[in-house]
Amino acid sequence: MLKEFKNFILRGNVLDLAVGVIIGAAFTALVKSLVDNLINPLIGMFVQSSALAHLSVTVGKTKFTYGAFLNDVINFVITAFVIFVLIKFINKLFPKKEEIVEEQKNEELETLQEIRDLLKK
């Protein structure tokens, strides 16, 4: 049982996932710092509140802190955009095997078509 567990842990997918989770947590802290320390003060220059997270509206006795929600939306959009760019970059570096095979087939097809055209002459 320990041997099976060792094989499971040492498989590439599990290690890749663990590294991804650790890097993701560190990246989330970095994005939060970017939003809290750079983006929020810039927005604070244009609104009355110095911190975006403290923006709110009160209706009756209920207080709606929409600033905290906006803060989370900014964090999400930045994180999603950076992940999107990273995935596009990684996909360019490591094309899928299917894409490589398809490119080879296209080259073979072009070569065969050229040979056919030459034989027609």
From Swiss-Prot:
Membrane-traversing stretches: 14-34, 67-87
Keyword hit for Transcription regulation: no
GO molecular function, a single term: mechanosensitive monoatomic ion channel activity
Cellular localisation: Cell membrane
Similarity comment: Belongs to the MscL family.
Family matches, as NCBIfam families: mscL, PRK00567.1-3
Record-given protein name: Large-conductance mechanosensitive channel
Classification of source organism: Bacteria, Bacillati, Bacillota, Bacilli, Lactobacillales
Gene: mscL
